[in-house]
Curated annotation (Swiss-Prot):
SUPFAM superfamilies: Ribosomal protein S2. Keywords: Chloroplast, Plastid, Ribonucleoprotein, Ribosomal protein. InterPro entries: Ribosomal_uS2, Ribosomal_uS2_bac/mit/plastid, Ribosomal_uS2_CS, Ribosomal_uS2_flav_dom_sf. This is Small ribosomal subunit protein uS2c. PANTHER family: 30S RIBOSOMAL PROTEIN S2 PROKARYOTIC AND ORGANELLAR (PTHR12534), SMALL RIBOSOMAL SUBUNIT PROTEIN US2M (PTHR12534:SF0). Its main location: plastid. It comes from Eucalyptus globulus subsp. globulus (Tasmanian blue gum). One of its GO terms (cellular component) is mitochondrial small ribosomal subunit. It is found in: Plastid, Chloroplast. Belongs to the universal ribosomal protein uS2 family. It holds the Pfam family Ribosomal_S2.
């Protein structure tokens, strides 16, 4: 895997608050190598290590995108949801930003069935056929469609398991992470000072609570994915 320069700037990360961790009482001792200091009762993440692992992650996703691989971005908490959707749409990635339905990956056949139902209902709605049904039936199917749009809208074009999964908050998305580990799907994970750095394939120590921090990390990864996709289009 070729190493590239991704313009990862320590000052920019400080401005986004990437270095602010959790309170010192909430830490995971396994994060000790990634913590540089304690300040006013909170741990401070070592941004040099953040830059190193973010750069590694950018190299990985660039390489994967340049070979036509598929990505899934997961971040369902309120502070992450909007940034996840924007980043995924920009890079033409699949995403989950509302709720992780247990078994979404490990029980892929069920997810696939739901996606087929979702696509069929969307087709029916676009063709105006739902409005020709009795009111009660139409209302029920529209509720189903709304529910499927909420939870599966970000993966509606997914036809198989993703090649790489990017996870915004390890603790919040622990079920998704465990499913990836079970299936052997490579993961890139933002980890705050209360997380376990050994679970993901690449763990990026960073503030997973601040919107600016989440957005900065996702923007770097998405830029690398877009660059990789451009390379794939030029050299299929």
């Amino acid at each position: 895997m070729t190493r590239r320069y991704w313009n990862i700037n320590l000052e920019e990360m400080m401005e986004a608050g990437v270095h602010f961790g959790h309170g010192t009482r909430k830490w995971n001792p396994r994060m000790a190598p990634y913590i540089s200091a304690k300040r006013k009762g909170i741990h401070i993440t070592n941004l040099t290590k953040t830059a190193r692992f973010l750069s590694e992650a950018c190299d990985l996703v660039f390489d994967a995108a340049s070979r036509g691989k598929q990505f899934l971005i997961v971040g369902t908490k309120n502070k992450a949801a909007d940034s996840v959707a924007r980043a995924a749409i920009r890079a033409r990635c699949h995403y989950v930003n509302k709720k992780w339905l247990g078994g979404m990956l490990t029980n892929w056949s069920t997810t696939e069935t739901r996606l087929h139902k979702f696509r069929d209902l969307r087709t029916e709605q676009k063709a105006g056929r739902l409005n020709r049904l009795p009111k009660r039936d139409a209302a029920m199917l529209k509720r189903q469609l709304s529910h499927l749009q909420t939870y599966l809208g970000g993966i509606k074009y997914m036809t198989g398991l993703p090649d790489i999964v990017i996870i915004v908050d390890q603790q919040e998305e622990y079920t998704a992470l465990r499913e990836c580990i079970t299936l052997g799907i490579p993961t890139i994970c933002l980890i705050d000072t209360n997380c376990d750095p050994d679970l993901a394939d690449i763990s990026i120590p960073a503030n997973d609570d601040a919107i600016a921090s989440i957005r900065l990390i996702l923007n770097k990864l998405v830029f690398a994915i877009c660059e990789g996709r451009s390379s794939y289009i030029r050299n299929p």
